[in-house]
């Protein structure tokens, strides 16, 4: 099928009056996938009891199977969550960390998950230690050396992003996981921006825990994410919300329902009270949508557009790039010589209808552009012309 920006843009529900260069924040869902999402909701509302108490679990299993094939792991090592923030907040209490333990991370982590770690560190007494990653980054070796510089014999876990949210860096996770195994340290990876963005092979990477969002670059409806847990670690997992899939009476309950999974891990997290799980069921259709439109070529085109846009903007501003080209995918964070970050974002959106993500960085405004299949060269040209007028 034709996968040019001109043909893909009408497939999305995005406001045509907005130059949308912020896919990375919350994603955007194609119309066929959104239609499927609503069809699952209609099935739920047509037969609420039959669907919610019986049929949905087979559909969830099928969805997890498709996701497992896509990221190369066992479907029963996956559970769905609305977002990685939710997944990390569920995971941390199950680690049973105490005042003798340390968790090593970076200063590049996503703020919401970072807050969860800080809260539980204060509550349980473990140390949450951040390796400072100086920018610009120059090499993988430099990053790894800086990251491991704060590891100690008390480091029990490493937690870091596969792709950083604010700075859009693709971190050398395979090397970090490999070194962590040598040091006998368990790994927790936040891959919120990974599924549908860069290849993910869980078995090859072999992390202990991995969470990712499907509503970003895989283009599912909002609120579809997963948590992978290595099988031998699943018995330690406990949900924050306890419901029918948990406890000694589970087998008795299972015998009288269609709850069929043999995985305790799956059951304790699937049953979390009444909720609409329709979005979770769209994962197979989202994968198929991208296959139909040869999304590998879309990603390649978008990556080239990101690098070209970054080159043009840094030539305009004279400010340094934050990383080499091969650290980037379909996003890039770029410095801009304007002090007031809030005013910068407001002017772009209110005056020029450009949606991007902004942040402050060492006295400069920084902004992150995201290029998805529906973005055209004209979108980038409009951004750069606007930036020229703001300097």
Give the label of every model feature segment.
Residues 1-391:
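Pyridoxal 5′-phosphate
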